[in-house]
Amino acid sequence: MNVTLLIPARYGSSRFPGKPLAHINGKPMIQHVYERASLAKGLKDIYVATDDVRIKNAVESFGGKVVMTGENAASGTDRIDEAISILGLADDDLVINLQGDQPLIDPIVIEQLVSVCERHAGEFDMATLGVEIKDEAQLNDPNHVKVVFDNNHNALYFSRARIPFGRDTSDYPVYKHIGIYAYTRKFIQTFAKLPLGRLEELEKLEQLRALEYGYKIKVAISAFDFPEVDTPEDIRICEARLTVD
């Protein structure tokens, strides 16, 4: 199974314009993501998928590979869909979609996701990761997406709200979704053609489209958590973690 990792990156952001190029300890964030991903074993190729020449130049300056996509991609998934067509990947090639706002991604979780797909090929349509929330502040923070899953670790729902809700107790695990996905080229091309889902539009969560149309999402549980960058304030958190690491 050939495995290609793609990092969709766009310059425009309502909360944090230019986020992929924001410097963290002297390097643009996209470089941290790329270099950490490159430590994962079993990957054939890594590319940044972008429509912005500033991001392209930054990635190429540190030796990274870039796929230039069009400016009209409505979402990261649409950008991934266009990139895999440009790259000419085979239908059964595995594609890892790693968000460009995860400069502290542990390569072990990438390997974990690939392993799940290899061991359980054909049992689900896409796979992702979750981690038990240990920080109380994340429980009611809509920037930290929660996930619930069945006994076979197939996703039941993703939400920006705290789920599940304990009517009589607060002593139970809540899982946060980690924004990394795995799927075949064939599935992502099917997914990208689906109309937007009602729940997807309400929550602004793309993965809900798959559930709304009856596709299975496997949720593997990670032992590692790491901060994502949603706002400029998150940069300081990442810098502190990198100093400790």
Swiss-Prot record:
Disulfide bonds: none
Residue runs in coiled coils: none
Entry's EC annotation: 2.7.7.90
Sample GO molecular function, one term: 3-deoxy-manno-octulosonate cytidylyltransferase activity
The protein's role, per its UniProt record: Activates KDO8N (a required 8-carbon sugar) for incorporation into bacterial lipopolysaccharide in the Shewanella genus.
InterPro entries with a match to the protein in the record: Cytidylyl_trans (IPR003329), KdsB (IPR004528), Nucleotide-diphossugar_trans (IPR029044)
Keyword tags: Cytoplasm, Lipopolysaccharide biosynthesis, Nucleotidyltransferase, Transferase
Protein's name according to its UniProt entry: 8-amino-3,8-dideoxy-manno-octulosonate cytidylyltransferase
Gene that this sequence comes from: kdsB
Protein's organism: Shewanella pealeana (strain ATCC 700345 / ANG-SQ1)
NCBIfam families: kdsB, PRK05450.1-3, PRK05450.1-5, PRK13368.1
Major localisation: cytoplasm
Signal sequence region: none
UniProt pathway annotation: Bacterial outer membrane biogenesis; lipopolysaccharide biosynthesis
GO BP terms, alphabetized: lipopolysaccharide biosynthetic process
Gene Ontology CC entries for this record: cytosol
Top class in the EC scheme: transferase
Catalytic activity: 8-amino-3,8-dideoxy-alpha-D-manno-octulosonate + CTP = CMP-8-amino-3,8-dideoxy-alpha-D-manno-oct-2-ulosonate + diphosphate
Cell location: Cytoplasm
Pfam families xref list: CTP_transf_3
Family to which the UniProt record says this protein belongs: Belongs to the KdsB family.
SUPFAM superfamilies (UniProt xref): Nucleotide-diphospho-sugar transferases (SSF53448)
HAMAP family attached to this UniProt entry: KdsB
